[in-house]
Amino acid sequence: KTTGYASVDFETNAKPLYNNDFKPTILSVTFQPGSGISIPLQHFDPSVEYLQKNNKWLRWLRYFGKEVIENPNIVKIAWNWKFDNQNFKKYNIHHRGTVIDGMLAKYLLNEERPNGLKDMVKKYLPEFAGYEKYDKFDSIPWDKKPLEDLCRYGCMDTDFTLRLALFLEEKLINKGFYN
Protein backbone atom coordinates (compact mmCIF):
# COMPACT_ATOMS: atom_id res chain seq x y z
CA LYS A 1 0.00 0.00 0.00
CA THR A 2 2.94 2.31 0.66
CA THR A 3 4.36 2.41 -2.88
CA GLY A 4 0.98 2.36 -4.63
CA TYR A 5 2.22 -0.28 -7.10
CA ALA A 6 2.02 -4.08 -7.15
CA SER A 7 3.57 -6.08 -9.97
CA VAL A 8 2.07 -9.58 -9.93
CA ASP A 9 2.70 -12.88 -11.68
CA PHE A 10 1.25 -16.34 -11.18
CA GLU A 11 3.26 -19.47 -11.88
CA THR A 12 1.23 -22.60 -12.46
CA ASN A 13 1.64 -26.29 -13.20
CA ALA A 14 1.05 -25.39 -16.89
CA LYS A 15 -2.26 -27.23 -17.10
CA PRO A 16 -5.18 -25.42 -18.79
CA LEU A 17 -6.88 -22.97 -16.41
CA TYR A 18 -10.28 -24.69 -16.36
CA ASN A 19 -9.03 -28.26 -16.11
CA ASN A 20 -9.52 -30.04 -12.78
CA ASP A 21 -5.77 -30.64 -12.49
CA PHE A 22 -4.84 -26.94 -12.92
CA LYS A 23 -2.90 -25.53 -9.96
CA PRO A 24 -1.48 -22.08 -9.30
CA THR A 25 1.84 -22.93 -7.64
CA ILE A 26 2.97 -19.46 -6.50
CA LEU A 27 2.03 -15.81 -6.79
CA SER A 28 5.00 -13.44 -6.94
CA VAL A 29 4.71 -9.75 -6.10
CA THR A 30 7.00 -6.74 -6.36
CA PHE A 31 6.10 -3.46 -4.71
CA GLN A 32 9.34 -1.62 -5.52
CA PRO A 33 12.21 -2.22 -7.97
CA GLY A 34 14.90 -4.61 -6.78
CA SER A 35 12.69 -6.70 -4.53
CA GLY A 36 10.01 -9.34 -4.60
CA ILE A 37 8.14 -11.87 -2.53
CA SER A 38 6.44 -15.11 -3.50
CA ILE A 39 3.34 -16.53 -1.88
CA PRO A 40 3.31 -20.33 -2.13
CA LEU A 41 -0.08 -21.65 -3.19
CA GLN A 42 -0.50 -25.22 -4.47
CA HIS A 43 3.15 -26.12 -4.85
CA PHE A 44 4.16 -29.74 -4.25
CA ASP A 45 7.11 -28.93 -1.94
CA PRO A 46 6.71 -30.70 1.44
CA SER A 47 7.61 -27.49 3.31
CA VAL A 48 4.32 -25.90 2.20
CA GLU A 49 2.16 -29.02 2.40
CA TYR A 50 0.26 -27.51 5.35
CA LEU A 51 -1.21 -24.92 2.95
CA GLN A 52 -3.26 -27.63 1.23
CA LYS A 53 -5.16 -28.54 4.40
CA ASN A 54 -8.52 -26.77 4.45
CA ASN A 55 -7.39 -24.75 1.42
CA LYS A 56 -5.27 -22.44 3.54
CA TRP A 57 -3.46 -21.38 0.35
CA LEU A 58 -6.79 -20.07 -1.00
CA ARG A 59 -7.39 -18.01 2.13
CA TRP A 60 -3.93 -16.47 1.70
CA LEU A 61 -4.65 -15.73 -1.97
CA ARG A 62 -8.04 -14.17 -1.23
CA TYR A 63 -6.57 -12.06 1.56
CA PHE A 64 -3.93 -10.74 -0.84
CA GLY A 65 -6.63 -10.19 -3.44
CA LYS A 66 -8.77 -8.19 -1.04
CA GLU A 67 -5.88 -6.07 0.25
CA VAL A 68 -4.06 -5.46 -3.05
CA ILE A 69 -5.89 -6.51 -6.23
CA GLU A 70 -9.28 -5.15 -5.14
CA ASN A 71 -7.74 -1.98 -3.69
CA PRO A 72 -8.43 0.85 -6.19
CA ASN A 73 -5.53 2.90 -4.78
CA ILE A 74 -2.90 0.36 -5.84
CA VAL A 75 -1.82 0.26 -9.49
CA LYS A 76 -1.66 -3.35 -10.62
CA ILE A 77 1.16 -4.21 -13.06
CA ALA A 78 1.70 -7.41 -15.05
CA TRP A 79 3.20 -8.69 -18.26
CA ASN A 80 0.15 -10.17 -20.01
CA TRP A 81 -2.43 -9.14 -17.41
CA LYS A 82 -5.02 -11.30 -19.14
CA PHE A 83 -3.36 -14.46 -17.80
CA ASP A 84 -3.02 -13.22 -14.23
CA ASN A 85 -6.50 -11.69 -14.23
CA GLN A 86 -8.02 -15.01 -15.34
CA ASN A 87 -6.32 -16.64 -12.34
CA PHE A 88 -7.65 -14.00 -9.96
CA LYS A 89 -11.17 -14.29 -11.38
CA LYS A 90 -11.10 -18.08 -11.04
CA TYR A 91 -10.78 -17.54 -7.29
CA ASN A 92 -13.37 -14.73 -7.14
CA ILE A 93 -10.86 -11.87 -6.93
CA HIS A 94 -11.79 -8.89 -9.09
CA HIS A 95 -9.37 -6.04 -9.70
CA ARG A 96 -10.30 -2.45 -9.05
CA GLY A 97 -8.37 0.61 -10.13
CA THR A 98 -5.63 1.02 -12.69
CA VAL A 99 -3.87 -1.87 -14.42
CA ILE A 100 -0.72 -1.43 -16.50
CA ASP A 101 0.08 -4.34 -18.80
CA GLY A 102 3.74 -4.06 -19.79
CA MET A 103 3.23 -6.26 -22.83
CA LEU A 104 0.42 -4.05 -24.15
CA ALA A 105 2.42 -0.89 -23.39
CA LYS A 106 5.31 -2.28 -25.44
CA TYR A 107 2.94 -3.19 -28.27
CA LEU A 108 1.42 0.31 -28.32
CA LEU A 109 4.90 1.79 -28.69
CA ASN A 110 6.05 -0.74 -31.28
CA GLU A 111 3.75 -3.48 -32.56
CA GLU A 112 6.57 -5.49 -34.12
CA ARG A 113 7.67 -8.63 -32.35
CA PRO A 114 9.14 -9.62 -30.01
CA ASN A 115 6.78 -8.54 -27.24
CA GLY A 116 7.81 -11.02 -24.55
CA LEU A 117 9.18 -10.13 -21.14
CA LYS A 118 12.46 -12.04 -21.60
CA ASP A 119 13.10 -10.22 -24.89
CA MET A 120 12.44 -6.83 -23.30
CA VAL A 121 14.70 -7.67 -20.34
CA LYS A 122 17.44 -8.52 -22.84
CA LYS A 123 16.92 -5.19 -24.64
CA TYR A 124 16.37 -2.77 -21.74
CA LEU A 125 17.90 -4.58 -18.75
CA PRO A 126 20.76 -6.46 -20.46
CA GLU A 127 22.57 -7.17 -17.20
CA PHE A 128 19.72 -9.58 -16.36
CA ALA A 129 19.39 -11.20 -19.81
CA GLY A 130 18.94 -14.96 -19.66
CA TYR A 131 17.81 -15.01 -16.02
CA GLU A 132 15.36 -17.83 -16.83
CA LYS A 133 18.31 -20.07 -17.74
CA TYR A 134 19.95 -19.78 -14.30
CA ASP A 135 20.78 -23.28 -13.01
CA LYS A 136 19.02 -24.71 -16.11
CA PHE A 137 15.70 -23.56 -14.66
CA ASP A 138 14.16 -23.35 -18.13
CA SER A 139 14.81 -27.06 -18.77
CA ILE A 140 12.62 -28.22 -15.85
CA PRO A 141 8.89 -28.80 -16.56
CA TRP A 142 6.60 -26.27 -14.85
CA ASP A 143 4.94 -28.90 -12.65
CA LYS A 144 8.34 -30.07 -11.34
CA LYS A 145 10.19 -26.81 -10.67
CA PRO A 146 11.56 -26.67 -7.10
CA LEU A 147 9.85 -24.11 -4.87
CA GLU A 148 12.91 -22.00 -4.05
CA ASP A 149 13.99 -21.76 -7.69
CA LEU A 150 10.44 -21.02 -8.81
CA CYS A 151 10.11 -18.24 -6.23
CA ARG A 152 13.43 -16.70 -7.30
CA TYR A 153 12.28 -16.80 -10.93
CA GLY A 154 8.83 -15.39 -10.11
CA CYS A 155 10.31 -12.50 -8.14
CA MET A 156 12.67 -11.66 -11.00
CA ASP A 157 9.68 -11.70 -13.37
CA THR A 158 7.71 -9.27 -11.21
CA ASP A 159 10.71 -7.04 -10.51
CA PHE A 160 11.60 -6.72 -14.19
CA THR A 161 7.95 -6.30 -15.14
CA LEU A 162 7.63 -3.39 -12.71
CA ARG A 163 10.82 -1.73 -13.98
CA LEU A 164 9.87 -2.15 -17.63
CA ALA A 165 6.21 -1.18 -17.21
CA LEU A 166 7.12 2.08 -15.47
CA PHE A 167 9.72 2.81 -18.16
CA LEU A 168 7.23 2.07 -20.96
CA GLU A 169 4.44 4.01 -19.25
CA GLU A 170 6.65 7.10 -19.21
CA LYS A 171 7.24 6.65 -22.95
CA LEU A 172 3.48 6.37 -23.53
CA ILE A 173 2.87 9.58 -21.58
CA ASN A 174 5.65 11.40 -23.45
CA LYS A 175 4.12 10.33 -26.78
CA GLY A 176 0.74 11.69 -25.72
CA PHE A 177 -1.12 8.40 -25.30
CA TYR A 178 -2.44 9.68 -21.96
CA ASN A 179 -1.45 11.93 -19.09
Label each residue range with its predicted role.
Residues 16, 25, 32-174:
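Active-site-proximal helix-loop-helix substrate-binding element of RNase H-like nuclease domains
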Residues 1-10, 14, 20, 24:
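N-terminal accessory regions of nucleic-acid-interacting proteins
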